[in-house]
Amino acid sequence: MNNYQIQPVEISADIISLLSGFYCGVKLMDEILHSQGLLSELHTDNPMAYCVYNEQKLLVGFCIAGQISLPFETDGCYAYVDMVDIVCLAVHKDFQYRGIGTAILDYICKKADIICSGADFIHVDALDLDDGSYSAVPFYQKYGFFYCSRSGEDAARMLYALYQ
């Protein structure tokens, strides 16, 4: 991922205009990224955007991450676990397969304790379309995420252990 720079950006209404010319090539994800609902439906604490720019200052990658508490059951007992939550991660369609998505994950892992103090896991509901036309699951599995369960119609809940 040479000559790219990742910059944290505060979440605001400006994010939608920033993403106006950004297309990853997956229709549902592009619709989400260009929707005002992207901001109103953030179910994570302290969300932050992470933008990847190339030398020409073109936005080539994008991620929103924050903190979430999810319930886990162990031996019949439930506990809530705080973890980093990747709300969305996308790479511009013209810049895919160049290591940008992996670089974003590397960055999120390095900043995990800042995003969510004491987090042991990163959580993502990876886009996984029921019709089989697209799945981000192999990308996350290649990085080391493990599949937990379905999460709604179009997503697979996945976790990554930060301290393996």
Predicted feature locations:
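Short amphipathic alpha-helix that is part of the acyltransferase structural core
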Residues: M1-S40
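Conserved beta-hairpin
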Residues: D45-I64
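Conserved acyl-donor/pantetheine-binding loop and adjacent beta-alpha core of acyl/acetyltransferases
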Residues: V60-C88
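Residue-level recognition of the GNAT/N-acetyltransferase active site
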Residues: V87, H92, L127
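Conserved acetyl-CoA-binding loop-helix of GNAT-fold acetyltransferases
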Residues: V91, Y97-A112
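Conserved GNAT acetyl-CoA-binding A-motif
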Residues: L105, A112-D128
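Conserved active-site alpha-helix within GNAT-family acetyltransferase domains
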Residues: S117-A119, D128-R150
